[in-house]
């Protein structure tokens, strides 16, 4: 149990440091110091810094991707899928806001960077989940055929921007009514 607690502490401290300084600006020694561990103790749990990053993805992002896929698959309609995806995405983002904001800023890291290599698969998975919503709704929206990826990117961008805006006010206020307003605005745009 102590090993698992230490491992989780390393992941949480790393999230905070990566959020505050960026992935490239943080070294393993700084993570070890903040965790009150020696470097060998940290290396017992993770081979290197990219191993920590992969641990973050496995511990926190993989389960979110599974939840997002489930809520979309269990939705009864196009609009229900959008709402359920957005509620899940926002609630997970607010629950672990620094992780979400770290990922949001770092997704624009250079294509060959360590971070990009670790995160691109997850980013693609999330985009594909949203894209599937639009692919399944082709019959509803005649203007959508061939533009599913554009719609998915715009939808994710709207949610992400609003999450960032609410955070910049130092208090995440993304609740059901805020998400409903975003969905309403998005639907108004695509139905016109």
Show where each model-derived region lies:
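Helix-turn-helix
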Residues: 5, 9, 13, 17-51, ...
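Amphipathic, non-transmembrane alpha-helical scaffold segments
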Residues: 11, 57, 61, 82, ...
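Solvent-exposed, amphipathic alpha-helical segments
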Residues: 13-20, 67-74, 154, 158-166
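Short coil/turn segments at alpha/beta junctions that flank glycine-rich nucleotide-binding fingerprints
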Residues: 20-24, 75, 96, 140
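Hydrophobic alpha-helical connector segments
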Residues: 55, 69-95, 148-155
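Amphipathic alpha-helical packing segments from all-alpha helical-bundle domains
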Residues: 62-65, 69-70, 113-139, 149-153, ...
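C-terminal peripheral helix-coil segments that are non-catalytic and often amphipathic
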Residues: 88-91, 128-136, 157-192
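Short secondary-structure transition hinges
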Residues: 90-132, 139-143, 163
């Amino acid at each position: 149990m102590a090993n698992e607690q230490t491992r989780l502490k390393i992941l949480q401290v790393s999230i905070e440091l990566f959020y505050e300084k960026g992935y490239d600006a943080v070294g393993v020694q700084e993570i070890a110091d903040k965790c009150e561990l020696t470097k060998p103790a940290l290396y017992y749990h993770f081979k290197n810094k990219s191993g920590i990053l992969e641990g973050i993805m496995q511990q926190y992002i993989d389960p979110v991707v599974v939840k997002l896929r489930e809520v979309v698959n269990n939705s009864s309609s196009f609009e229900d899928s959008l709402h359920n995806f957005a509620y899940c995405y926002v609630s997970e983002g607010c629950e672990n806001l620094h992780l979400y904001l770290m990922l949001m800023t770092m997704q624009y890291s250079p294509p060959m960077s360590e971070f990009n290599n670790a995160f691109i698969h997850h980013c693609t998975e999330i985009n594909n989940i949203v894209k599937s919503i639009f692919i399944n709704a082709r019959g509803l929206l005649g203007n959508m055929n061939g533009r599913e990826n554009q719609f998915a990117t715009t939808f994710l961008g709207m949610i992400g921007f609003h999450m960032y805006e609410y955070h910049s006010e130092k208090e995440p206020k993304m609740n059901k009514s805020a998400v409903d307003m975003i969905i309403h605005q998005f639907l108004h745009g695509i139905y016109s």
